[in-house]
Amino acid sequence: MATAGPGGSGGGRAVAGAPKRWWRLVVITHSHRRYPTYVDLGRVGVWWSGSWRSAAEPTVDVAAELESLGYGALWSSGGFDPGLSPTFGRLLAATTRVAVASGIVSMWTGAPSEVGPAVAQLESRFPGRFLLGIGASHAPLVSDYARPYSHMVAYLDALDALDTPVPMGRRVLAALGPRMLELAAQRAAGAHPYFVPVQHTARARSVLGPGPLLAPEVAVVVESDPEAARALAREYARLYLELPNYTENLRRFGFGDEDIAGGGSDRLIDAVVPWGDVATVADRIREHHDAGADHVCLQVVSGPGRDGFPLAEYTELAGALMAG
């Protein structure tokens, strides 16, 4: 049984006329114990798969500075380890209030028996600040990839059966298609789609309904020159356009073989990877909010030869996004 506060997720219902808030409050009853859980993500977060170290000061994380800029969450890749990466604890320790989320832990390698206790440990040290993102990964990356939906159901069952379960409100699914989106609404706080156009955000909201969290990742290029911006975007997109889960999802929105080949057509790149000056990129992020996203995970794609974290771009974008 799950009940939700205003704008909450799970089986609860938002209070009529209540203002929408950018957090989720869920209470799970499991084995006669109650787990009050919430994660405040804010409207915009940072998604990053590389080093969180400052280019200017290589021994210093940028997490505290991102928190001071107003970003509500820091999303980091979960990798393919059996447990949770130590990066999550390090980011939490370096900050005071910002949420930290995995985007994502692979259900094929992140064993529930390892992940669950690690989440509980983070909760004991940093109450209410860690969100577990779980995903099905991709057939080319997993040696024994079969029946991903059924495997995800079994994975969630295993998390629920732990001595210290991972509550529904503390987990999100990397959902793209309708079945996984429905599962995200029924068994998690919501969905964390990756590499999607704004049309997917609108459709995901219609599948999830008004309550569950919708937090898409959106990669951006802060570059006004079309040729240079699209070249950077294609370099980023090339890997994802070789993975069937992403290409099948893009086909749902009218993109064909000619769009997917060669690192992506201009039409596809422009739809999936917003580019332009800071104001233009900020407007494209707001389109996802207007389409139903509660929270957007912003991933800056920077040019070749750039070492360290692209803090300058995130600083500029924060000025535009936090202002409105």
Predicted regions located by residue number:
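Compositionally biased, low-complexity segments enriched in small residues
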Residues: 16, 24-25
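Compositionally biased, low-complexity flexible segments
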Residues: 1-19
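Active-site-adjacent structural elements that line small-molecule/cofactor binding pockets in enzymes
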Residues: 8, 21, 27-324
